[in-house]
Amino acid sequence: MSSRSRFDQAFKYARVIPFNDTDKFILFSDCHRGDNSGADDFANNRNTYFHALQQYYKNGFTYCELGDGDELWENLHFSTLYESHQNVYELMRKFYLENRLHLVWGNHDMIYKNPSQVKKNLHSHFDRRTGEERPLFPGIEVHEALILKHEQTGQELFLCHGHQADWMNYVGWRFNRFMVRVLWRPLQGAGISDPTSPAKNYLELIKVERRTKKWIVERNNQFTITGHTHRPRFPEPGDIAYFNDGSCVHPRSITGLEIENGFISLIKWQIATTDDGVLKIVRVLLEGPQKLIDYKTN
């Protein structure tokens, strides 16, 4: 199956979410929540991510996580991730209970393609304090893709992880997972990058972006948002409508895409220092806001 066929299939079976200009969405991906060890790339940005997500929760945003939220290549069990980042999952639970959480699977959490794995890992968790199973995201479904469809204009925003353009991380993901577990994770502490990841392999990153853009053009410039490469992208109207929300494992910040009042913006959250030496977490606008309708082609 070609990358085109994989994208076509994801688009065909995507969950459609109607929205209008009063709705607000925050899109993050590639959190890679791990076990809080030295190999956990998320741990350095956990406080930044948690604060940002709290602000979005308080301000009525819906959270769409576009894959690789859970690092299930390096870690065997979701329970390890929950115990390491319990405050994060409990905040996500609040979103879910208010119907404001949508999850997409990526290559590092591709086991969620299997509904039985979703039920086993996400519907409930074992509470060590009570010795009982406790609901976490009861009944949740994890999708390959989402389509945000505007109720007035009919515009469709296609959201997926983006590894559909990466054969080795879509078809060959089990082999890559094996290599990460037995080889690259132990070497990560020595500063050796995983060459199977497009986020750490520039040539592969370019190939993934090229295949994605080719599919977008073939679909009449279909508005598309992905993650996977960890490289934020925000096109001008009239260019190829390929957006990328970046990742939550940048060295000193997290990036994402906001949709609000019919506009889209690329943002980052980072720790900044005030003039009197106080550290605080701040939101920085990187690109936009740009009207969604400016990208409409059909």
Listing of model-derived features with the role each one plays in the protein:
Residues 1-65, 69-298:
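Extended recognition/assembly regions associated with phosphoester-bond processing machinery
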